[in-house]
């Protein structure tokens, strides 16, 4: 058993649709999780990441969602081990005024700009839903995501499908 970090609850592991752990045989393991920061005990929605070449020693990265559009309300994180970069993707529970919709589901992602183990996750994180420019997001209220990596010719493509929690049939 390897202790990597702390989480107040296991939102990344609560659903069979998320992929909190991803492996690239040439790079290693990348993990995404809902992180608990002891010096900020009121919030449990920080997004963290961990990297390991061998699955035994992990380096952790904290607070990936502290800048807009992140609101430190991350849910359902997933990791995608791309050929060159590790990606961390999650749903941010946002207020309706920041584009997530009535129930606040806004898919967001970041990646380690310095490759695996580089420790420089892109900030601010970016919208995965390209319908968020301009706000509000269209479609809104995207919550639990299922992600995978495929290739178009030789270029990696991240595929994502989200459940939509909307109170309106029109949405």
Indicate where each model-derived feature is located:
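Extracellular, repeat-based ectodomains that mediate carbohydrate processing or recognition
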Residues: 1-171
């Amino acid at each position: 058993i390897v202790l990597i970090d702390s989480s107040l609850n296991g939102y990344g592991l609560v659903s069979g649709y998320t992929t909190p752990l991803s492996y690239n045989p040439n790079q290693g393991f990348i993990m995404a999780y809902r992180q608990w920061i002891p010096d900020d005990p009121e919030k449990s929605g920080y997004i963290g990441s961990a990297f390991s070449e061998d699955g035994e020693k992990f380096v952790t990265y904290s607070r990936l969602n502290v800048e807009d559009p992140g609101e430190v309300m991350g849910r359902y994180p997933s990791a995608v081990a791309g050929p060159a970069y590790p990606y961390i993707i999650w749903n941010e529970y946002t207020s309706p005024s920041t584009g997530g919709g009535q129930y606040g589901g806004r898919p967001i992602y970041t990646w380690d700009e310095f490759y695996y183990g580089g420790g420089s996750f892109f900030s601010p994180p970016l919208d995965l839903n390209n319908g968020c420019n301009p706000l509000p997001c269209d479609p809104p209220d995207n919550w639990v995501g299922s992600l995978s990596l495929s290739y178009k010719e030789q270029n990696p493509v991240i595929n994502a499908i989200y459940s939509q929690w909307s109170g309106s049939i029109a949405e």
